[in-house]
Amino acid sequence: MNNLEAILRLKTIDAAKKLLGHFLVSKYNNKILIGKIVETEAYLYNDPACHSYSNRTKRNSMMYAQAGTSYVYFTYGMHYCFNVVTADVGIGEAILIRALEPIAGIEQMQLNRSKTKLIDLCSGPAKLTQALNINLKDNGINLLDKDSSILLRYNNDLINEIDIVQTQRIGISKAKDMPYRFYIKDNIFVSKK
């Protein structure tokens, strides 16, 4: 078991904190695009804001997969959101990756986003999926497999607990006051402070 696999087997709230500082990697157009995870949100099976709360559907079926599987969905008729499945198979929990700090493949991210400012590339769920060219084709990928087109990569430079801000989730209408959003303190790439 690698370190990321161990993180994703933690309770989803703990995993959402521990994913901060690790890397999301996309292999696109013969390039490697890398972003450091700087903001996450946890979604639990008993959480009214979670896609698996009511029942299992074709759209949310990947939320019930093995921890470390990607769950990508289309929202508002125009945006993709990228999640990492956590918990045991059949539970239906995931972590939304809300923001990344661009690390590598920045020129391609700028082309993908039609933006040049670093701060505009991955500072929100829809922005980061566009920057890394993540869409429904990436739903159900094993993010712990080094040969996957999208994967998680461990960062030995871990984030201290005192550098993690815990606050309410944003951009949702149900259970929005739950303190399930986490971000790296003073990081300029988070979507909203």
UniProtKB/Swiss-Prot annotation:
GO aspect biological process, one term: base-excision repair
InterPro entries: Formyl_transferase-like_C_sf, MPG, MPG_sf
Cystine pairs: none
GO molecular-function term, one example from the UniProt record: alkylbase DNA N-glycosylase activity
Enzyme Commission number, as recorded: 3.2.2.-
Pfam families assigned to the protein according to its UniProt record, in alphabetical order: Pur_DNA_glyco
Protein's UniProt name: Putative 3-methyladenine DNA glycosylase
